[in-house]
């Protein structure tokens, strides 16, 4: 694959970090955004630019796009990956943390896609890959808020798919089941225990799927890609 240019949000850990590492090994030039700035550089670090940015700020989307253009001359891919998980019943969930999750998962995703889409329309090509969830297609007890955020991303992606169907701009929603990341580190009981899943997915599984998707010929469209671990019933 020829050298391409990508912007990745949520690149400091989990799925975003795995995608960063996989793209770097495949000769991508990358602008990596992590809120903490703790983006670990591996292979081909000279082709990675780090932006420590808060995606809740209106200026961050423009900053990321401008960084890609000014440093690498273009942008081919946008990976929308930043997010967090807040769970609990509608009655008992921490409402402030829930609202922050909604802003990060929904508002910031819409905002950055809005910004990059205008550039992709101008250049006539581009690919947007959104990390959603299996809980963007269904819900379960104590997951209404998180599922609702992912439903919003799925709706955005489906509308974009139709609006862009006759263009060379593509969009894919990745819908993972349970992935072993730090997002569950503060949970009193890990979801793999609650769901009785022995072998969860790992971030590298998602990165492998991403490479498979973006390696397809451009006339092949993959709007959704659900990936689940064995034993994931919901």
Enumerate the language-model features and the residues they cover.
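Conserved glycine-rich cofactor-binding loop
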Residues: 12-13
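Active-site helix of classical SDR
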Residues: 113, 149-152
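Substrate-binding pocket helix/loop in short-chain dehydrogenase/reductase
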Residues: 89-90, 97-102
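C-terminal helical subdomain
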Residues: 173-174, 194-231
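Conserved glycine-rich Rossmann-like NAD(P)H-binding loop of the short-chain dehydrogenase/reductase
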Residues: 26-41
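Alpha-helical segment proximal to the catalytic Tyr-Lys
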Residues: 118, 162-165
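Residue(s) in the substrate-gating loop at a strand-loop-helix junction
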Residues: 133
């Amino acid at each position: 694959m020829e050298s391409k240019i990508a912007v990745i949000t949520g690149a400091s850990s989990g799925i975003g970090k795995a995608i960063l590492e996989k793209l770097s090994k495949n000769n991508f030039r990358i602008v990596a955004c992590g809120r903490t700035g703790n983006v670990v550089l591996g292979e081909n670090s000279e082709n990675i630019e780090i932006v420590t940015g808060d995606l809740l700020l209106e200026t961050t989307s423009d900053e990321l796009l401008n960084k890609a253009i000014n440093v690498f001359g273009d942008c081919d891919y946008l990976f929308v990956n930043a997010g967090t998980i807040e769970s609990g019943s509608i009655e008992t969930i921490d409402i402030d943390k829930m609202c922050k999750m909604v802003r990060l998962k929904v508002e910031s995703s819409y905002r950055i896609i809005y910004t990059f889409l205008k550039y992709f329309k101008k250049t006539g090509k581009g690919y947007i890959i959104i990390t959603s969830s299996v809980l963007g297609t269904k819900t379960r007890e104590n997951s209404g808020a998180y599922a609702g955020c992912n439903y919003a991303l799925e709706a955005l992606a489906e509308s974009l798919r139709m609006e862009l169907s006759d263009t060379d701009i593509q969009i894919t929603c990745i819908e993972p089941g349970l992935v072993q990341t730090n997002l569950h580190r503060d949970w009193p009981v890990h979801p793999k225990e609650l769901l009785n899943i022995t072998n969860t997915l790992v971030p590298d599984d998602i990165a492998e799927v991403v490479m498979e998707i973006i390696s397809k010929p451009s006339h092949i469209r993959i709007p959704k890609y659900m990936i689940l671990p064995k034993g994931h019933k919901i």
